Amino acid sequence: MVEEKTIRLSQVARKLNVATTTIAAYLLEKGFRVENKPNTKITLEQYKILAEEFADSAMDKEEAAELVIGQSYEKEPKVIAKQQEPIKHVHPKEKQVEIEKISLPVIDAPTIIEHKIIEHKTEEPPILQPELPTEEKEELEVIESPQAPQEELKPELETEVQEQDKEIQQELDDTAKVEQAPITKGPEKIDFSKQGEFKGVTVLGKIELAEKKEPKKFQQVASSDIDKKNKKRPRKRVASETGLPSSGKREEEANRYKPKGKVTNKTPEAPKTAVSEKQIQDQIKSTLAKLGGGKNVASRAKYRREKRSLLAEEQAEERLQAAKDAKKLQVTEFIAASDLASLMGVSINQLLSTCMNLGMLVSINQRLDAEAITIIADEFGYQVAFTDVKTQELEEEEEANPEDLVERAPIVTIMGHVDHGKTSLLDYIRNTQITKTEAGGITQHIGAYEVVTESGKHIAFLDTPGHEAFTAMRARGAKLTDIAIIVIAADDGVRPQTKEAINHAKLAGVPIIIAINKMDKPQANPERVKEELAHLNILVEDWGGKYQSQGVSAISGEGVKELLEKILFEAELLELKANSHKKARGTVIEASLDQGRGYLATIMVQDGNLRIGDVVLAGAYYGKIKAMFDYQGKPVKQAGPSTPMQILGLNGAPQAGDLFRAMNTEKEARDIATQRQQILREQGFRTKTHITLDEIGRRLAIGNFKELNIILKGDVDGSVEALSDSLLKLSTEEIKVTILHKGVGAIVESDILLAAASDAIIIGFQVRPTPPVRKLAEKEGIEIRLYSIIYDAINDIKDAMEGMLAPTIEEIITGSASVREIFKITGTGTVAGCYVTEGYIKKNNSIRVIRDGIVIYTGSIKHLKHFKEEMQQVKTGFECGISITNFNDLKVNDVIEGFEQKEVERKL
């Protein structure tokens, strides 16, 4: 796009000779709002409008600029005076110059003057006839002798003229035509040369009338009064005749200086210079006064009103701009939904419900693209400005050569509800038993595998978790895949996560294949599954729809072969191709921190060829690939399209779902990664909101508001994201869950210090702290909870929230007994003979000793006997003997009260 040319306001003001305030006011009247600042830019259209309005001011400025010619005019008379003297000395040579200058047809004035000179020559030839046959040099000597009296006047002018006389004589001796640029001086020389021949003509100075006094002096000394009169008359005639061909500006200037310079001063030089400078300065001042003060003085009050109105408008604009800025968000493209809600100052539940109304399935930690962010922000009345990371060069795809395109394997994602047999089905296909290695028998990571069919075709499988906490993982799998397989248990039907998986696949625009699993069970009912799918607008081919379906059994292997054939058939229809010769690009599936090797990233190469030693940029991290492993852990040297791979060498753990790309140089990758880290860091600062007075008031109104701070560490980024998403959903009006920090890797010392400073608990998901870290946690009193199953972590935090780690303990009084007698027995201690007055006394219950209404001891029963028989419980109306652990100070009439403590969970 060609940018429209603009002009700064200060430049316009100089060109049009108008103040910037006036320009801003006029543009405002024309409907253009422009700030009254020198650097404000206006368009050419606005400049044309201003040029038409202020054309007079521009013309005034041009006329004022022309006054500078007066300074050059002062110099010209000096030059003319200097020219007169040498011209008289070189009178015979000037005749030759005149003959040469006749060849110049450009200027009319010299031709007219020449005719007049010829007339004078007709009068004087008899006097000069004897001198004509002599050489020119001799004539110069003869002429110099009669002009001796004129040399007496030269000393008066030598101080100003002597140097330039020499220059003019040299120019006349060398050439009279060489310099054509100062054409205006040509006729001047001719005029003054003629004045030198006939002293009446030398006074002509037709162009420069200011110097007519100088020839007068020369005329008085060298000629008679009659000659003077004769010279004055042709002088006026020459001025009138030569005024036509000469420049009009000089004629006007001559007329200006006639009455002022000549009438008042008889001396030619000193008065001229002084008066001309004053005149020029006065005229400049008067002109500038007209230009600068004419309009402003006349409308000074108007301008004051305009300034006040402009100031008020600027203040209103500033207030309006501040209000707009408050509704303008500066975000990166891939920001989490929770961070977006924090920036807009709305609750995450409100944002999620709005997304549901818009037909968008969004989780708390799901990163939103630019379109989704714009739509959501618009619903809440915000404008979005995206911060550019300067990655346009990364988005530019290399032009694919059709010869380099080769067929690639399809990427298939298996999705569905939890416990519907997704991983078991994949186990049968791969002849492995992955489910036995997963904690709790459920998939908690997104796995990437490669399978070779009997026909030799390759298929890349992505196994996604089915638990509701792993919504973001399923969304990433749907975006990454070519074909989606929805696994539904034939005995369970369509479940909530089944619907969610179908919606993810639809939003991603990928083909769907329905796999009805557990067909080997007697209660399997595939027709019911198809009916439920029909209610979701998913019609299988058996019901006249477009979606393929296949009944399978992960135990017996029924229908698995047919399912693979349908996958390959769908892939053929898609005509999947990729270029294996260009630099690799793809998506990060998972990222983890391996204690012995460093950051390990699981990626899916979607295009190009990835090799060891390539510089890779993934999200905000980069690095040179040190090693590559396939899904079985075997080292490989390169990976082509549709190949799942694990790579080592990144300087950090990228987020699951980040795009990766092989870069040309390490410097390029480092620069982009640094920019992204800066933006993410700034984004984190902006999303951290401090408590406000309104929030304090809300918490005081609730009365028992509490906040649960959590530091979350996990083995892979996907699990950390899923667990963080689930925990944030537990927040209520009374209890707020805050994830202070989340990351990939083991629990380290910095996590303990952060927890100690912020009164937080640490949750580790499939990670363990090192012994020094555990000791530091015990020293600081920091609680570390470790989990391997996401269910347990969520449930424990939920329970902790209900009681904030201190469940309510209810005390139930079971009975009481009064002390009737005291017995001291050696080896046993004090035994109280009691009578149960209420309830029952149970040996395992706690008791308290009450004397005169005051509790003096709380403990447990050591022995409880009825007669000599040890009892577990004594009911009302019976006597018993009670001995208390570590307490012998019993007295008659003491009351022994039995009670039990029962923990009651506080419900939210």
Swiss-Prot record:
Pfam families: EF-G_D2, GTP_EFTU, IF-2, IF2_N. GO terms for molecular function: GTP binding; GTPase activity; translation initiation factor activity. Residues 517-520 are annotated as: G4. Residues 441-445 are annotated as: G2. GO terms for cellular component: cytoplasm. Residues 407-577 form the tr-type G domain. Residues 463-466 are annotated as: G3. InterPro entries: EF-G-like_DII (IPR053905), IF2_II (IPR044145), IF2_N (IPR006847), P-loop_NTPase (IPR027417), Small_GTP-bd (IPR005225), T_Tr_GTP-bd_dom (IPR000795), TF_IF2_bacterial-like (IPR000178), TIF_IF2 (IPR015760). Residues 553-555 are annotated as: G5. Disulfide bonds: none annotated. Residues 416-423 are annotated as: G1. It is found in: Cytoplasm. Its main location: cytoplasm. Keywords: Cytoplasm, GTP-binding, Initiation factor, Nucleotide-binding, Protein biosynthesis. GTP binds at residues 416-423, 463-467, 517-520. Residues 123-154, 212-278 are annotated as: Disordered. One of the essential components for the initiation of protein synthesis. Protects formylmethionyl-tRNA from spontaneous hydrolysis and promotes its binding to the 30S ribosomal subunits. Also involved in the hydrolysis of GTP during the formation of the 70S ribosomal complex. Belongs to the TRAFAC class translation factor GTPase superfamily. Classic translation factor GTPase family. IF-2 subfamily. This is Translation initiation factor IF-2. It comes from Amoebophilus asiaticus (strain 5a2).
